[in-house]
């Protein structure tokens, strides 16, 4: 039997997940008295932005976050090196339209700068500096281009060149695990082709830390921190969200937690989600 590989486009279309978000219920209209119009779960960038937009639309909203801070994977640490250091998300793509870049540019507290080109980096193999003669970028471009141009729903490992090259394992880690979060055997060339064709500008960085920028951008957004969601009951009209601080009733629930949280089973769904959705949490 042919193995099916995960495609984020297909995942978003079939599981109602956009920006890692699920909505419950999708069609049900509630006539009951509810605590809120919408309960947003997760105060990462997606959850915070959704909360802001819903408030602007006149909705009664509550945003719940299990940890003690907002920002999700956008988190700046100032203790490790004595300088701002992003432990998660650290650059901004699509500078012409990126709202975080616009916020940073319009706020004197932040200094944004373009990422330096690859020629500005020094690469080492052990204690030996890698020179241009090593053709590491040729290998990178060859592997990346081959995956992107394949346009088929097959695993990259079936088509990528340079598999005997000394830099193949490095590129496997870079293009596979680092860029896509999966090994070459576990995602689709068709999916990578979609990402590859999206026009992007040079990445931008924030001297003060991208995590800090996100926290400042949404510092007035109302969020209930240290509130862990245990169960989402969407069996009736509206939804009931059970947390470690009590129950919350709403017309709709918007979930923006990571796929890691969804696949861990930490949040119970009643009734259970479809097998297709459950499997997609583990494959994406």
Regions flagged by a language model, labelled:
Residues 2-284:
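FAD-dinucleotide binding site
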């Amino acid at each position: 039997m042919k193995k099916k590989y995960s495609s984020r486009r297909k995942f978003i279309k079939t599981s109602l997940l956009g920006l890692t978000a699920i909505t419950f219920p999708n069609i049900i209209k509630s006539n009951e008295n509810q605590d809120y119009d919408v309960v947003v779960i997760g105060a990462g960038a997606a959850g915070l932005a959704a909360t802001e937009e819903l408030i602007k639309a006149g909705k009664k909203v509550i945003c719940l976050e299990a940890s003690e801070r907002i920002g999700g994977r956008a988190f700046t640490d100032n203790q490790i090196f004595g300088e701002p250091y992003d432990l998660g998300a650290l650059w901004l793509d699509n500078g012409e339209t990126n709202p975080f870049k616009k916020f940073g540019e319009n706020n004197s507290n932040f200094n944004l700068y373009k990422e330096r080109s690859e020629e500005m980096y020094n690469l080492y193999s052990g204690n030996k500096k890698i020179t241009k003669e090593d053709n590491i970028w040729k290998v990178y471009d060859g592997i990346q281009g081959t995956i992107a141009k394949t346009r088929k729903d097959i695993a990259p490992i079936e088509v990528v060149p340079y598999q005997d090259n000394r830099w193949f394992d490095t590129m496997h880690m870079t293009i596979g695990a680092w860029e896509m979060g999966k090994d070459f055997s576990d995602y689709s060339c068709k999916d990578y082709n979609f990402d590859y064709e999206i026009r992007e500008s040079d990445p931008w960085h924030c001297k003060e830390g991208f995590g800090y920028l996100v926290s400042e951008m949404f510092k007035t957004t109302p969020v209930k921190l240290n509130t862990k969601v245990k169960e989402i009951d969407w069996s009736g009209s509206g939804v009931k969200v059970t947390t470690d601080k009590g129950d919350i009733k709403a017309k709709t629930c918007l979930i923006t937690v990571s796929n890691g949280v969804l696949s861990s089973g930490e949040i119970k769904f009643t009734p259970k989600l479809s097998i297709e959705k459950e499997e997609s949490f583990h494959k994406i």
